[in-house]
Curated annotation (Swiss-Prot):
The keyword Lipoprotein does not apply. GO terms for molecular function: carbohydrate binding; metal ion binding; toxin activity. This is C-type lectin. Keywords: Calcium, Disulfide bond, Lectin, Metal-binding, Secreted, Signal, Toxin. A motif (Mannose-binding) lies at residues 119-121. InterPro entries: C-type_lectin-like, C-type_lectin-like/link_sf, C-type_lectin/snaclec_domain, C-type_lectin_CS, CTDL_fold. Residues 1-23 form the signal peptide. It comes from Cerberus rynchops (Dog-faced water snake).
Length: 158
């Protein structure tokens, strides 16, 4: 009986591998980071257009949220290595109520910030969305008008 079980499990493994089941891995064009998959899109969109694009792309998709230095480092390396000259890049942080109360679009906790020196400065009371600041090597954040056009990083949970 145990031979039947072993053979059955073997066939199941073959079937799953042939059917493309990958378990907990990201698609080839995405990078894996702390249980999420990320991909940079070079198309320039407003913050809201980028967020809507990410939501439509994958179930549970949103602009990227960052929760520790290692998250910032991984994404900075990815952008710098693969998309030279991309400019600033939208992430999922914004001040929806315009009260300097920053929230992630995926509703995860806002427990980490990596603002560039002097930021957020809310120039002309109109900077309510956040991008990775290119001159910092994508490690620091800057607040920006949400209508600005930038490339963006989507993410979804594995």
């Amino acid at each position: 009986m145990w031979q039947f079980t072993v053979v059955s499990l073997g066939w199941l493994a073959v079937f799953l591998s042939l059917s493309g089941a990958k378990g907990n891995s990201c698609p080839a064009s995405w990078i894996s980071r702390n249980g999420v998959c990320n991909k940079l899109f070079p198309d320039r969109k407003t913050w809201l257009e980028a967020e809507m694009y990410c939501r439509a792309l994958k179930p549970g998709g949103h602009l990227a949220s960052l929760h520790k230095d290692s998250d910032s480092t991984v994404l900075a390396w990815y952008i710098s290595d693969h998309f030279k000259g991309a400019g600033h890049v939208w992430i999922g942080l914004r001040d929806t109520n315009k009260k300097r109360s920053w929230k992630w679009s995926d509703r995860t906790s806002t427990n980490y910030f990596s603002w560039n020196q002097g930021e957020p400065n809310n120039v002309q009371d109109n900077e309510n969305c956040v991008h990775l600041w290119a001159p910092s090597g994508y490690l620091k954040w800057n607040d920006e008008p949400c209508a600005s056009l930038h490339p963006f990083i989507c993410q979804y949970k594995l």
